[in-house]
């Protein structure tokens, strides 16, 4: 599958601040008649949004320690990247070459993007922002690494300091990032994580997504948070029922 097709497939991982369309041409939003409560009624392709039993995001609590969980192997590299305001979020499309290995499977990094506030919560508390690093295996499986971010007045995020000056403010605009971008700069020192099986967090809400959420949060400055929220005041989906799913925690 070519990269543009992958990007369309994964568009549901982003969210919108005003009514936008998916690759099916169907509008969806986070408020009003196009909002989450009606997603499943907007298009037959969105049915999982209403009836799916493995939906994301979820509240992370009572995670069970599983000492057998393997570390996530990161093989990220610096390279050219393009930033786009896709009408859902600010998305960075990365050059080929960065990937993770998890449970013996290689997942190539396709893109990363942001949600404000975070989609997922920890014991009922949302974070100020989250970056979702979206990966795809050779056989089409999706794995998303989530890094929660918390506002810290005196500590800007180094990678955001590189990215934000190029941030496109108008839907459809793209910008080449002048510096090389290494997504590894987002990763916390402590690689402990939570994991569960979920879905894309927006239409079509496709299930079977492997979620890997770091337990350690990373900082961003108030100014960095405001710069994003000025474009997307809210682009996150309400929490979904676990329906008996278990959340596991690594050591």
Go through each PLM region and give its residues:
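Alpha-carbonic anhydrase
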Residues: 2-251
